[in-house]
């Protein structure tokens, strides 16, 4: 299995080195044809509407596992610091207030929160499957099971990964005396590695068709790299050109959040398009290697 994956990965990288220009043009033409800039705007809008319900549901799922109660704060700090540039603290304050209000609702309100959260996952599912030209819909029971699995297992997997990371970093290997050695490098690379893993899971689980693991891995690498570049570039812009604060005042967090969510979805969709295009562009060779 590892030999097969390594062979396919090596072939794919060799193919990209020799025909990377044509492949980039192919991806860009598909990106424009699929109007992914419009799709990113739609998903950003749906995400902002569903953000509080999704977080409320996720934290509700985590509360069912007492071991994750102590990790909630660590998860929040990790996510806001590494995935929401510059506005993390202010955004955390607002979202905590919204979630506190949402979790005090009745059973009907909680049901509505779950429905809205599922609607977000459904929108992601439909738009990503359009990129893969997958027109065959999932049966309702299968779709609901997949959505519910994401809502329930997602917090468990994230909490588990952070728990493992916390345990590793507590070892003597990552003490102060080795902070500038291998421990420091691994600590700095954790956001990138988590991004690669997240994109890899999305590009393999969400499409309602067969996706080669090597293609999903390359797409995840592309998306994770672009995500890190976008995060740093956006943080530099927000820090050095704070004119948006003079324009929007106390509401400045809203456009900042919307633009960042929009850029994030552009990255996700471009990585998905890269993964799908690898399957189309390399189809004859893939059939030979099968």
From Swiss-Prot:
Query: What topology does the record note for this protein and the membrane?
Result: Multi-pass membrane protein
Primary residence: membrane
Say if the entry is tagged with keyword Transmembrane: yes
TM spans (from-to): 48-68, 104-124, 144-164, 182-202, 216-236, 250-270
Report the record's disulfide bonds: none
Q: Which InterPro entries match?
A: UPF0761_bac, Virul_fac_BrkB
Keywords, alphabetical:
Cell inner membrane, Cell membrane, Membrane, Transmembrane, Transmembrane helix
Give the location in the cell.
Answer: Cell inner membrane
Q: Does the keyword Transmembrane apply?
A: yes
Tell me any Pfam family this protein matches: Virul_fac_BrkB
Q: Give an example GO cellular component term for this record.
A: plasma membrane
- Tell me its family: Belongs to the UPF0761 family.
What is the designated name of this protein?
Answer: UPF0761 membrane protein ASA_4118
Organism name: Aeromonas salmonicida (strain A449)
């Amino acid at each position: 299995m590892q030999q097969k994956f390594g062979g396919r990965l090596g072939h794919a990288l060799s193919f990209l080195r020799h025909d990377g220009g044509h492949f980039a043009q192919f991806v860009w033409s598909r990106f424009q044809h699929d109007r992914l800039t419009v799709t990113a705007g739609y998903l950003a809008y749906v995400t902002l509407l569903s953000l509080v319900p999704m977080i409320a549901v996720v934290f509700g799922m985590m509360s069912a596992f007492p071991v994750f109660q102590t990790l909630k704060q660590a998860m929040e700090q990790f996510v806001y610091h590494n995935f929401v540039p510059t506005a993390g603290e202010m955004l955390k304050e607002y979202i905590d207030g919204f979630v506190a209000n949402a979790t005090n609702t009745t059973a009907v309100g909680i049901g509505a929160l779950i429905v809205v959260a599922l609607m977000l996952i459904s929108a992601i599912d439909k738009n990503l499957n359009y990129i893969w030209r997958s027109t065959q819909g999932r049966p309702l029971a299968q779709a609901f099971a997949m959505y519910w699995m994401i809502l329930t297992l997602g917090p468990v997997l994230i909490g588990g990964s952070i728990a493992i990371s916390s345990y590793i970093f507590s070892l003597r290997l990552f003490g102060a005396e080795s902070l500038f050695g291998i421990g420091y490098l691994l600590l700095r690379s954790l956001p990138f590695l988590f991004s690669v893993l997240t994109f890899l899971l999305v590009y393999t689980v969400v499409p309602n068709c067969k996706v080669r693991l090597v293609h999903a891995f390359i797409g995840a690498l592309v998306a994770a790299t672009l995500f890190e570049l976008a995060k740093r570039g956006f943080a530099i812009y927000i820090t050095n050109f704070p004119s948006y604060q003079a324009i929007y005042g106390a509401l400045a967090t809203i456009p900042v959040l919307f633009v960042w969510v929009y850029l994030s979805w552009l990255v996700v969709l471009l990585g998905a398009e890269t993964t799908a295009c690898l399957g189309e562009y390399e189809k004859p060779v893939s059939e030979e290697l099968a």
